[in-house]
């Protein structure tokens, strides 16, 4: 969507893996974590000088972008593999191919799988075409030579380091990964998908089964913090601010909305000053 392309920015985190098994475990867990992380770090309620009523308008814009190439890959199935991910890319409608310094528009008329079989107006598929197709696939978590986690609003100060600290604490510690998998074991794909759709409006107050996102968020932070302490990384200090927000059931967006509709009197200069103070 134009809003997503022109008006939004986010923080991405990249995770290494050592084997297909390791990659798929981290990939599935990152997908399950993603709506909770989006809720925790929601920080984009203002658009065009107006309180949108959403905690993360960036998150909303992604819900209204091409659903063929966005969201979760492969319904987070337990059997998901490298081959399955490639199959998702292959079955995604194509946007364009690049030939002789020109873009040839395909406008979603064919999938990459169909392009390989049938070509397009005399053009045949190349490895470069596949690489472009993979780059134009925008799931919550993208698989490259690393795992690219893509679902966080821009935040400032220690909050941006908190995103990294949480993933470091969980993804590089088998015990922490075990605990997260246990935390999510009663949730199905539809639960994560419904939460993803509810988070832009409600952030941590969104419901998931018989709980709220905030209940899971608190546990996620605890698991990451225990891991960082156990491994003596010295990174737990980066969690202090997000812990404070989460304990109150708040995201950064809640503070912005309160001030915007209160003492800031909807003054963009005060919003900009506040955001600058966070960096």
Which functions belong to the PLM regions below?
Residues 1, 5, 166, 243-245:
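Mature, function-bearing regions of proteins
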Residues 1-142:
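Loop-rich catalytic cores of soluble enzymes, especially ATP-dependent carboxylate-amine ligases
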Residues 53-60, 190, 242-253:
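Amphipathic alpha-helical surface "interface" segments used
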Residues 75-97, 211-239:
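An exposure/low-complexity boundary signal
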Residues 78-82, 105, 120-123, 127-130, ...:
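Intrinsic-disorder-associated interaction segments
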Residues 106-118, 135-136, 143, 147, ...:
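Acidic, mature catalytic/reactive cores of soluble proteins
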Residues 146-235:
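Substrate-recognition/cap regions that form aromatic- and gly/pro-loop-enriched pockets
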Residues 224-279:
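C-terminal amphipathic alpha-helical interaction region
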């Amino acid at each position: 969507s134009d809003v997503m392309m022109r008006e939004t920015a986010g923080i991405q985190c990249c995770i290494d893996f050592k084997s297909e098994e390791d990659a798929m475990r981290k990939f599935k867990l990152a997908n399950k974590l993603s709506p909770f992380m989006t809720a925790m770090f929601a920080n984009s309620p203002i658009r065009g000088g107006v309180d949108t009523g959403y905690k993360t308008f960036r998150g909303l814009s992604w819900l209204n972008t091409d659903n063929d190439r966005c969201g979760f890959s492969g319904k987070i199935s337990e059997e998901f593999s490298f081959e399955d991910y490639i199959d998702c890319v292959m079955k995604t409608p194509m946007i364009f191919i690049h030939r002789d310094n020109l873009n040839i528009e395909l406008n979603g008329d064919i999938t990459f799988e169909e392009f390989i079989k049938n070509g397009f107006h005399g053009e045949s598929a190349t490895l470069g075409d596949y690489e472009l197709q993979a780059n134009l696939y925008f799931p919550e978590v993208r698989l490259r030579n690393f795992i690219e986690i893509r679902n966080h609003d821009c935040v400032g100060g220690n909050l941006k380091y908190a995103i990294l600290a949480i993933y470091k604490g969980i993804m590089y510690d088998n015990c922490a990964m075990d605990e997260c998998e246990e935390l999510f074991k009663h949730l199905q794909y539809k639960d994560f998908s419904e939460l993803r759709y509810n988070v832009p409006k409600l952030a941590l107050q969104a419901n998931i089964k018989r709980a709220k996102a905030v209940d899971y968020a608190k546990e996620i932070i605890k698991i990451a913090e225990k891991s960082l302490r156990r491994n003596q990384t010295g990174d737990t200090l980066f969690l202090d601010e997000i812990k404070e927000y989460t304990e109150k059931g708040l995201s950064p967006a809640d503070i912005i909305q309160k001030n915007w509709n209160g003492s800031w009197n909807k003054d963009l200069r005060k919003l900009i000053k506040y955001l600058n103070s966070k960096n």
